[in-house]
Amino acid sequence: MTAPEIRRLSQADYPAFERFLSGRAESSMFLRSNARAAGLDYAGEAFQARYFGAWGTDELTGLLALSWGGHLMAQAPADLLGPLLAALQAEEPEAMATGLLAPADQAAWLLERLKPAPESVKLSEIEPLFRLDLDRMAVPEPLRTGVLVARRAGLEDLDFIVPWRVVYDVETMGGLRPEMEADARAAIAAWIERLPIFLLETEGRPVAMAAWNAELPDMVQIGGVFTPPELRGRGYGRAAVAAALIAARDRGATTAILFTHTPAAERAYRALGFEQVGLYHIALYDPGVRLCPLP
């Protein structure tokens, strides 16, 4: 059997990139959305990545990428992860991974090689991955009847979204750090400039939010779902997600993806019609993890 060719991708490889990932769409949203927004060439700019591909008979058979922010992203069978990681290490010997985004089985293989120090792990979760055909969504009654309404957030909303985001980050990663508010403000401002955040309101008062964190012409991925602790248990988070999905459907999307690690959120998403289609691993590291050479 001929060994696959492993090489760095360029924009000329985009058609093959899309053909490969479109068959693995549910677990490839970050890869596809970023590449659609910023291309496959790398100049260190936002949403770009260094993409390495394994090739067989003129088609991609595996993919590994290191994003501009240091997130390692994979979509490859286990027997190709080693050669792909070796190629990345050889070309980027000083590179650090600040995060890992991959299907759970692929992430497990990579973690065995990266061996992040326990103190550097700020988040490491295997989360159920869910899919919904938007024409089958069960829209919550308060949203259908207008008791709850949603609108797209703007930069003028930062003063109350940022404290929400700080609570979200503390709940997700633990520990309140002095820089969290400034980091949250920068992250939310950048998010609003690129992808929509939707605010759910009742009687003019914001009570929850949900956002798109990746988009394609026919698909969206939902993230950033948050309800303030004192308002939880009232269905606001579920309605916020539904509002974000209605906007996606109105724009032409037919499919939605999301993942979650909490039972309450899972129940809410299943009530909308989401069904589990896999497991996805999300990890964040600070300090970053050096991409170690293979033994």
Where do the language-model regions lie?
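Conserved donor-binding loop and adjoining core beta-sheet/short helix segment
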Residues: 2, 9, 19, 25, ...
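Conserved catalytic-core motifs of GNAT/GCN5-like acyltransferases
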Residues: 122-134, 257, 275-293
